[in-house]
């Protein structure tokens, strides 16, 4: 294993909050492989780069010689995590959860080492609790404690319903840590309440409490909201290399440094050198190309990364249109602003109107100036800015 100081520096890279750091240092000094857990409810089949921030950190622990478990919440996925929700999340069927879980496993192994990764399902212990076990688990907390959660508090104050089973979710996630005797649990900053519940339940069960490590939420392509499919600002890990390359090149120069910190495995000293070069006049585009190629090589191959770079150069330095682009179908009567939003070319309808006004939207290579246009039936190519293309069919 690496020295404690070197290991701690690697572990803390990009971390938003570590609770508590001194306990992590004490665990590292035990000079044994720590039990590291990352849990995920397979509520959707596809993973985007925002999800990989925490997976990258799990890989760091793996590379440092620790025992890593990727826990699939097949039981909790059927309950539904209420985190950040102002309404009760619709429960998934077991068939949905298991189907999504298979896709999850295929995608996470693009980051994690399959030979060093333990996959577990929390139904292994949660389905055995039974009514008595559930009541005993619920007795560890109070309604007042649950209402300390921001999302529960807001719903309660606004008179919005909170289902009893939603109160159980943090307890079930916390019990995962008891069942696994976890040393360190990873999660996003939005999971803080649930992660700390694991510490509390471990103490109640006579275990040493886990260390909680939280990673920040990755900002999406728009530079404002967290990366998500609903915001149309994401990069899927299974997207075509050319599509990934173009999207990464579209981020702002400032956001690029955050992506380097959270998505790259390059040494921090090398990233600092890149920053110095840009400060001294180097073109940030060249540094961004290195980032794009690193990410694409990880999820596809180095050959794909090289080809995507060449296509990017051909497309934007020689004015060529990409051979591959996302394709969409819409019913006739859709407004141009809605079309651009639904095709993922802009973040919102107001953004669409602004881009049209600025002359940044093209229809089949011609500048589009009518912000009230109702596109005619047929297939056309829409372009926003230099890098975003979509082939749209109006039926």
UniProtKB/Swiss-Prot annotation:
Annotated S4 RNA-binding domain ranges read 334-394
Molecular function, one GO term = ATP binding
Cell compartments where the protein resides: Cytoplasm
Q: Where is this motif: 'KMSKS' region?
A: 226-230
Which Pfam families does the protein's record reference? S4, tRNA-synt_1b
The UniProt annotation places ATP binding at 229
Gene3D superfamilies recorded for this chain? Answer: HUPs, RNA-binding S4 domain, Tyrosyl-Transfer RNA Synthetase
Gene Ontology CC annotations of this record:
cytosol
Q: Alphabetically, which GO biological process terms does the record hold?
A: tRNA aminoacylation; tyrosyl-tRNA aminoacylation
Entry's InterPro entries? Answer: aa-tRNA-synth_I_CS, aa-tRNA-synth_Ic, Rossmann-like_a/b/a_fold, S4_RNA-bd, S4_RNA-bd_sf, Tyr-tRNA-ligase, Tyr-tRNA-ligase_bac-type, Tyr-tRNA-ligase_bac_2
* Subunit annotation: Homodimer.
Q: Which family does it belong to?
A: Belongs to the class-I aminoacyl-tRNA synthetase family. TyrS type 2 subfamily.
Cross-referenced NCBIfam families, in alphabetical order?
tyrS
What is the protein name stated in its UniProt record? Tyrosine--tRNA ligase 2
